Each structure stands twice: as C-alpha cells, then as structure tokens.
Regions:
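Conserved nucleotide-sugar donor-binding
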Residues: 157-168, 205
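Nucleotide phosphate-binding site architecture
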Residues: 32, 42, 167-168, 209
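A conserved catalytic-core signature of glycosyltransferases
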Residues: 156-157, 162, 178, 197
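Short aromatic/basic micro-patch
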Residues: 127, 161, 201-202
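Nucleotide and nucleotide-moiety/phosphate-recognizing core
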Residues: 16-123, 127-156, 188-195
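Conserved hydrophobic/aromatic beta-strand scaffold that supports enzyme active sites
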Residues: 147-149, 159-161, 182
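Conserved alpha/beta core of the MobA/IspD/sugar-nucleotide pyrophosphorylase nucleotidyltransferase superfamily
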Residues: 2-20, 168-216
C-alpha cells in the first residue's frame, strides 16, 4: 500500500458537537491470534495503534462519549489507557472469546438512552485517521437517520455509524458477525463514503511489514 501513515493535531469541525448524540465504540477486545501478540500495542514511531485510534475518535466525538471495549488483554491495556487518556469509559467484555459480536453488544449495552448514533471504530486500521472519521461524521450529521459506512469493493464496512434505530440489530449479532452484516441488510439506505485507507488492516506480521509511515 503506497499511502503513508500521517500525523496531525488538527481537529475536525465536528469535534465539539457533543449535543448531537453521536457516541463512539472503539473495539479493542480481540486476542490478535494471527499476529501472535496484541495488535493494540503494535508501535509505530510515535505511539501504539490503539492510542492512534483513540486520537482519531476523539477528534470527532468528545472524550466522554467514547467507549473503549477491552477483552483479551483487559488488564494489560488498562494501565496504558490510564497513563495516556482521560474522560473516556472503558468497557470490559468478559465474553470476548465469543467473537466480535460480543464486543459490539458490550459497547451498545453501555450506551446511554440519549445516544442517537454510534460510530464503530477498530484499532487495527492504522491509515484511518481523524480526517477519515470526519468525513463519516459529517455525512451522518447531514442524514442522522441513516447508516453511514466506509466504501469497500464488496460493499459497506467499518468504520461506520449506525443510527439509534439500528442499535437493536447490533445486540442480535452472534459470533464473528460484525457491523457489516447490518450495513448489508440496510442496502441502499446506507450512505457510503470513499475511504481507501480503511482497506488496510493489521492481522499478521506480513501486514506489519507493509506498514509505512509519513513524517508530517
């Protein structure tokens, strides 16, 4: 992949839009079985991937509207979050071995009743940044009753935003069924945002060897 990993402290225009009811669920509960060690802790030249994902999420949603779902490495990751982050809420998914659906349920169950939508973010998409998520949130804020998702060759995928009317569907997922299942069912009602940077994720050591970094 030719895109370089870039850094920026710029905030999107929606960063302080805390009254619109958009919350973020960041999934960081997996075991990283294929990689062999926690991908959440994979370090680029500046910080672990999990902290980069949190930075991106906090650029578009207030810290107190961010839920980080931990699981396999709950005890190992909590100190890192305590040292580097504030304001967000940590949710422990004790059933992380049941698959990603269990983490989605844990996150949705922790949302307050006033949440109008949920932004779903992963920790293993290193090229997804604040500007990527800013495009999603801008589209959702124009159409808050619709799902908004990254465009993949095979249809919609994460990162994605689901409106409140679809949150019950997340609770019904099982095993390794993710948000894509719901987005596919929503069909043409899902708004797609071009996001080629989302296509790269870190699952194996080979993926790490392809990861490149920018200097800005």
């Amino acid at each position: 992949m030719s895109t370089s990993l870039q850094y920026s402290t710029a905030m999107t225009s929606s960063a302080l839009a805390s009254s619109d009811g958009l919350w973020c669920v960041l999934l960081a509960a997996g075991e990283s079985r294929r990689l062999g060690y926690p991908k959440q802790l994979v370090r680029d030249p500046i910080k672990p991937l999990m902290l980069r994902a949190i930075d991106a999420a906090q650029a578009v949603t207030p810290a107190d509207q961010l839920l980080v779902v931990l699981g396999a490495y709950n005890l190992r990751l909590r100190p890192l979050l305590a040292r580097n982050c504030s304001g967000m809420r940590i949710v422990n998914n004790a059933h992380w071995q049941d698959g990603i659906a269990s983490s989605l349920r844990a996150g949705v169950d922790a949302l307050p009743r006033q949440a109008r939508g949920v932004l779903i973010v992963l920790t293993d998409q290193p090229y997804v940044n604040a500007f990527s998520l800013g495009r999603l949130t801008a589209a959702w804020r124009r159409h808050p009753s619709r799902a908004v998702a990254a465009r993949y060759p095979n249809g919609p995928g994460v990162p994605a935003i689901l409106p409140r009317r679809l949150l019950h569907s997340l609770r019904e997922l099982q095993g390794d069924m993710g948000a894509k299942t719901i987005l596919d069912k929503a069909g043409s009602n899902t708004l797609l945002v071009d996001m080629p940077e989302a296509a790269f994720d870190v699952d194996t050591s080979e993926d790490l060897s392809l990861l490149t970094y920018g200097s800005s």
